Amino acid sequence: KIGLFGQQAPGFVDLHPDPFALHKTFQGCILEHVGLSDLIQAAEATDQANLDADRKLNVPGAFAERVDDERSSRLYLALKRLVEAENLDAVAIRCWPELPRDYGQWPYLAITRLADEGLPVACEGDVDGALTMLCCKFLGCGAPYISDWLEHDHSSFVCWHGGMCPTCLTSHEGPGAPVIKPHFNNKKPAVVDATLKSGMDVTVCRFWVCDGAYHAVICNGRSKPPKR
C-alpha cells in the first residue's frame, strides 16, 4: 500500500497517479490518499513528551545540530504515526508549496530520517517514484534515493535533488557529509545538504505510466565524484 499525502506538485502532470493501472499491474497494490491538512493536524497534535524525547535524539548520520527541530520532529513523528496507522509500505508526499508556505517547514529532514529507517519516501507526490523505490527495497537493492536528472554525457549523468537523501548513501565526515541547512530557495528549514558517496555500485531505474500501461527502465552503474 502506497500513501499519497496531498497530490503531485504543481505542474508535474506526468506524475499524476493511475490507481487502476497500479492495482492491475502490481497485483493489488493500493493507493491511499491522505490530506496534507491531516498531516499538519497530526503534527500539531503530537504528544509533548514524545516530541521532547525526539528532540533529544541525534539525527542519523554525521550531524547532530537541528534547525527548527520542533516542527521537523512534529512532521517526522506525524508521518511515522500515520504510516503505522494506515499500514503503508511507501509514501509519496507533496512537499511544496503548502508545507513550507503554510507550516513554515520543509519535510526533507523528516523524510531523510524515515528513509534511514528503511521507508521508501518520494517527494513532490511522485507515486510511481515511491513504487519504484518500494520495488527496489523488496529486491534488496539497498537504500533507494529519488532524484532529478540534471545533465548527462555519453557515459554518465548528474543527479540532484533538494535535501532528503538517506545519510547511509553519503560520506559521514569531510566534504559532502550531511549538514542541515535552510532551503536554498526560500531559506526555510530544513533540508539535508550532502553529496552521494563515490564508488558505490548503483541501480538506476524508474517505473512510469503511459496510455494506461506501466513501463520501466533499468541500468547499472557506479557513483563517482561530481564535476562541480
Q: What do the predicted segments below correspond to?
A:
Residues K1-G104:
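A charged, amphipathic alpha-helical module
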Residues P19, K24-Q27, R71-K80, E84-R228:
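Anaerobic metallocofactor- and corrinoid-dependent redox/one-carbon enzyme cores
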